């Protein structure tokens, strides 16, 4: 989250990204989106999880300001996302797997001194830190709080295909290379089957990968209008030991 003193640096980052030929910039701040627009939009703008996209009206504002893709906030259901995509006329990115972003700050919770002087930065955020209270768990990464359970829509990919969604995200930030590789491979195969339009059933290797990389269990987030930590499904329900 840029502050006033960061704005000149934001402009330089946009220039550097354009020179490097990146596919897009993920933006979580309308001020940064304006900087990109004032520079002529040299790089496509994708609005991220902290941009407060809850309705098609908000998505429309960001579209008019230059965004070509939006990621609705975690609390937005799949039904609401479909309306948002249709009414705003903008690409919608759907989180299908991984930790759910729940909060962000520009100050690191894990450090005891300012970033520029704390010797633990940036190594400390590469470690795993959990916030626990009885039955619930959250993961802190310093400047953000993530869900403890992994979002998992493996069982529901045919619905996503039928609803017209085409942009999918696996949240692999702060995860291991094995997590990104194995979960990514499972979804690549599963999405291919789902979009083929035939019979869809989870392969053991897909569900095994989901279980193996979710030590705190699985959930569907708010996709179906339920509590965020709930899992709706039949095959992977057993991943949540306390349920």
Positions of the model-derived regions?
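Conserved nucleotide-cofactor-binding alpha/beta core module
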Residues: 56-57
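A cross-taxonomic marker for long C-terminal extensions/tails that follow the last structured domain
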Residues: 66-67
């Amino acid at each position: 989250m840029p502050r006033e003193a960061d704005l000149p640096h934001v402009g330089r980052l946009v220039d550097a990204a354009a020179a490097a030929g990146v596919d897009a910039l993920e933006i979580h701040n309308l001020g940064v989106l304006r900087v990109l627009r004032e520079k002529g939009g040299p790089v496509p703008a994708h609005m991220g999880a902290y941009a407060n996209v809850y309705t098609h009206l908000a998505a429309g504002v960001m579209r008019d300001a230059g965004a070509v893709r939006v990621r609705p906030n975690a609390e937005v259901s799949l039904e609401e996302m479909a309306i948002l995509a249709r009414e705003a006329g903008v690409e919608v990115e759907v989180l299908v797997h991984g930790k759910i972003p729940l909060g962000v700050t520009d100050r690191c919770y894990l450090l005891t001194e300012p970033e520029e002087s704390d010797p633990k930065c940036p190594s400390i955020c590469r470690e795993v830190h959990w916030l626990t209270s009885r039955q619930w768990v959250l993961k802190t990464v310093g400047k953000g709080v993530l869900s403890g359970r992994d979002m998992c829509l493996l069982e529901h990919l045919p619905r996503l295909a039928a609803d017209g969604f085409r942009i999918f995200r696996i949240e692999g930030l702060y995860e291991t290379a094995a997590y990104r590789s194995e979960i990514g491979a499972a979804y690549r195969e599963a999405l291919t089957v789902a979009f083929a339009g035939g019979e869809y059933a989870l392969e053991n290797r897909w569900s095994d990968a989901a279980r193996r990389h979710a030590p705190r269990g699985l959930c569907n987030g708010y996709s179906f209008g339920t509590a965020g930590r709930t899992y709706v499904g039949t095959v992977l329900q057993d991943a949540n030991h306390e349920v």
